[in-house]
A protein has these predicted regions:
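Acidic/Gly/His-enriched mid-domain segments of enzyme catalytic cores or analogous surface patches
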Residues: 100-104
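Charged catalytic cores and adjacent phosphate/nucleic-acid-binding surfaces used
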Residues: 1-18, 22, 36-49, 56-77, ...
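Short beta-strand/loop segments at the ligand-binding rim of alpha/beta enzyme cores
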Residues: 51, 93-98
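Conserved beta-strand positions in the central sheet of alpha/beta enzyme cores
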Residues: 28-31, 98-99, 129
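Short, conserved beta-strand segments within well-ordered enzyme catalytic domains
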Residues: 28, 53-55
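Short acidic/polar active-site loop segments enriched in Thr and Asp
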Residues: 25
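Short secondary-structure capping/junction motifs at helix and strand boundaries
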Residues: 78-80, 98
Length: 228
């Protein structure tokens, strides 16, 4: 899920409190090319004693703008690098690499050729998102079918940019902690699920605000990071 540290509309406190209200045990905060929101959320949980695990991560922009999730990595990763280098770097830092909204044409996403190329090279891509309630997640069923051959851990993610969408998709796993979730990924013991209730409707003004952050603010922040 995303916070105001990239193109989400909820700040870390709002994201944490909404996740708890939704009954989630663990969340992964994955702002675009930034771990600041995730670190802030985890610090808040520790300070306030909230009953929630926070996985620090980011949604990394690789070559050609393709996105990849890096979980359990507490530093910002270089942008626009080849996928193979990014996956190897994530592993070297002790993290796990996951393919979000695979096969989607609505946002730069890992395609079949990229995923199978990484696996052919023996690179440690660990999981693939098979449930994502956003429009970008529509190819999820096809990804689930292809994953019978890939053998990756499946996971569900809300990809929430709006607070009401938190928990719209989730991952079942044995245990209740971030460490349990990681072990389940490694054991291919995760199950992707979508919430029973329909996806919450978002007011047009909020879509406009989020689009502005996504199309103007977030790219400007990325440009500053690249030029530093």
């Amino acid at each position: 899920m995303h916070t105001t540290y990239s193109d989400g509309l909820g700040n870390p406190r709002e994201v944490v409190e909404t996740a708890i209200a939704r009954g989630l045990d663990v969340i992964a905060v994955t702002d675009h090319d930034s771990v600041a929101g995730a670190l802030a959320a985890r610090e808040l949980v520790h300070k306030e004693g909230y009953p929630l695990g926070v996985i620090v991560g980011s949604e990394v922009t690789m070559a050609r703008g393709v996105h990849l999730l890096a979980l359990f990595v507490e530093e910002r990763l270089p942008m626009f690098e080849p996928a193979a280098r990014t996956v190897a770097r994530i592993a070297a830092l002790g993290g796990v690499a996951l393919a979000p909204h695979p096969l989607s044409r609505l946002t730069p996403s890992p395609g079949r050729r990229l995923i199978e190329g990484l696996l052919a090279e023996g690179l440690p891509l660990l999981g693939v998102e098979t449930v994502n309630p956003s429009p970008a997640g529509r190819p999820g069923e096809r990804a689930r079918s292809l994953n019978k051959g890939w053998g990756l851990a499946e996971f569900g993610g809300s990809d929430a940019h709006f607070l009401p969408h938190i928990g719209a998709a989730y991952t079942l796993f044995p245990g209740r902690s971030a460490a349990d979730f990681r072990r389940a990924l490694e054991a291919r013991a995760t199950v992707a699920r979508r919430a029973d209730e329909p996806l919450a409707r978002i007011p047009l003004r909020d879509y406009a605000r989020q689009s502005g952050r996504s199309m103007i603010l977030n790219p400007a922040q990325k440009l500053l990071r690249v030029n530093r």
